[in-house]
């Protein structure tokens, strides 16, 4: 009936401990006072442990932990605080798989049968020795696991505070610090309850073993003092003071800058009161200046802005290209306009303040200096309400801070430094951030649509020209075949008056007969050559429609022949 224990693996370190196959309760006649005291103490401590394990606060904190890990898995998967928080989650999952709560609940329900018995009977029902040993073994394993959980919480706390000192993911790190602190406090209370449960439960085991011995774990002896069994981690968790990480890393100053403290609250309240008073005065002036003439009067609003040397708002001024234009404009004009808009969006902004920032960035010789300069630029952009530039510089500041710590450890990164400096300078001077904006993408789409609209009429013209050339070539081929056939039929009996209606004029003009006959022979030979060339050109046109030079030349020859014939 003993549980099989693999060599080299302690029974308390097993996730699933098999239950005993024998009966779970033993009836005791005339129980002694020591047994009654042990039963009462075990019932009390079991009830308190079950309440602490079923706490809704523990469930809520566990759900928050799982949600934080799930939502930040992609961007924080390689960060040390995130990995340490994963170890905390693994400890909680293993504690849940142990089914400690179910075992203690079963033990607690075995004692409930004694309440239904009358007081006159001196019979008591107690759990058997295998059941008590199983619960004791799970308590030992849970105490070891909770000590490991507390240690993981401490490591996560310290790593998160260290990461908070880098001024990266501040809100997330604060959430993790608070979450780990609450888990440490709550499970430390659960550990205390389990330690308090072990002592009366060990006394109950001795009484039950004396009444009816049925050992379940024969190769393992339960310790009488659980604190000695837990060893040094127990004393570190309960006796040793926790390190003060916030004061050592200067996190208090950072948090005081981000979140308002009591010393700064009077100043802030005074500033808000001054702002409210100014708004009230402006409202009074506006009420006095109102003119009621029965009709709405449009007041000209003049917005006056403070003059500044460096106006980064010019970055955001993009040329709006109208996609819908008249199709009567030439294609060359549209191309020139597109080129002007393209180059105008990339104009170099040479204001003094931008040049001063760029000069400072270029003079930075380390990531420490570069981070300071970027921080100043971010503060300036936020003061001028330049959100896009502040976000861009903030991302560069995060990268510079990470590389700054690598540089502090002795790593030389000159190429990285030059690359980041170049990208920042290009963004400030040439407005490279505009090229990747959504508005720029929309502008490019509208330009492409406009180009397509301009190109469509040309394609139509090309198709119509090809059709006309084909029709004309077909007509010339038919006319040439008809004339050649007629010429063959009337070759011998044709009269010169049919070919030349003005033959009388030719005869009167003194044209001799041999000359006319030679001309007729030349015309006949030309018609044959034209017919052959026409058929050849037709086959060539079917293969390649774009080659139209031959057909145009042939049609010119046919026109000359018909002009000579008088048709």
UniProtKB/Swiss-Prot annotation:
Modified residues (Phosphoserine): 265
Domain of life: Eukaryota
Compartments reported by the entry: Nucleus; Nucleus, Nucleolus
Region (Disordered): 437-457
Keyword Nucleus annotated: yes
Cellular component terms per the entry's GO annotation: nucleolus; nucleus
Effect of residue 94 to C: In ANXD3; uncertain significance
UniProt entry keywords in alphabetical sequence: Developmental protein, Disease variant, Dwarfism, Nucleus, Phosphoprotein
InterPro entries per the UniProt record, alphabetical: Nepro-associated, Nepro_N
Transmembrane segments: none
Record GO biological process: negative regulation of neuron differentiation; positive regulation of Notch signaling pathway
Region (Nuclear localization signal) residue spans: 442-460
Consequence when changing residue 145 to F: In ANXD3; uncertain significance
Pfam name, any one: NEPRO_N
Recorded family membership: Belongs to the nepro family.
Function: May play a role in cortex development as part of the Notch signaling pathway. Downstream of Notch may repress the expression of proneural genes and inhibit neuronal differentiation thereby maintaining neural progenitors. May also play a role in preimplentation embryo development.
Medical condition linked: Anauxetic dysplasia 3: An autosomal recessive skeletal dysplasia characterized by severe short stature, brachydactyly, skin laxity, joint hypermobility and dislocations, short metacarpals, broad middle phalanges, and metaphyseal irregularities. Most patients also exhibit motor and cognitive delays.
Protein name (Swiss-Prot/TrEMBL): Nucleolus and neural progenitor protein
